[in-house]
């Protein structure tokens, strides 16, 4: 037997966050090692460091945390992938830096390409976060949520590339774009 339950789910990080963004902090907790639990494995055990990082972020007044990998490169949020925009170029860490291959991450990379927004996968440092013109997180629950500050360094309101991608993402998710209707299940 199978039971399927459906209910409305508000924005994971809040409706206001989708417009105004969230404050995030870089966590002292590192993302798990490739040698401990491979990033492609989505199990409850693989979220332990994320739980600790989220708790730390909340204690410091942040909505979310950004986790670094063992080498000190930007990895991901506690349950989200991260993107930055600098000089009109969209960047996100490569999977080889130890992050989960997010469905929403892949969607945003595809949409960016289709919208002629330059998008690359490259290793990012904490400094890259601090000098970003725009930043946002993606995930099945987080959808596409702008970041307005990182470690209390102000990035500002949702930027133009973030806004374009967010609008397109929601239009696709709600079946308003015929060329992506095969994505809707």
Descriptions of predicted regions:
Residues 1-185:
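Helix-start/capping segments and mature chain N-termini
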């Amino acid at each position: 037997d199978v039971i399927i339950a459906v209910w409305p789910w508000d924005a994971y990080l809040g409706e206001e966050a989708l417009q105004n963004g969230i404050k995030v902090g870089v966590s002292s907790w590192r993302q798990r090692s490739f040698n401990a639990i491979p990033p492609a494995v989505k199990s409850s055990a693989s979220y332990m460091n994320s739980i600790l990082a989220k708790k730390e972020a909340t204690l410091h007044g942040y909505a979310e945390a950004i986790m670094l990998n063992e080498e000190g490169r930007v990895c991901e949020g506690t349950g989200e992938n991260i993107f930055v925009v600098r000089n009109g170029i969209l960047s996100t860490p490569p999977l080889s830096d130890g992050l989960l291959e997010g469905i929403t991450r892949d969607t945003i990379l595809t949409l960016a390409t289709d919208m002629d927004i330059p998008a690359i996968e490259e290793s990012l440092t904490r400094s890259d976060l601090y000098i970003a013109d725009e930043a946002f997180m993606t995930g099945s629950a987080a959808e596409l949520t702008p970041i307005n500050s990182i470690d209390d360094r102000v990035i500002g309101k949702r930027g133009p590339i973030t806004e374009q991608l967010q609008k397109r993402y929601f239009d696709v998710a709600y079946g308003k774009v015929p060329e992506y209707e095969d994505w809707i299940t």
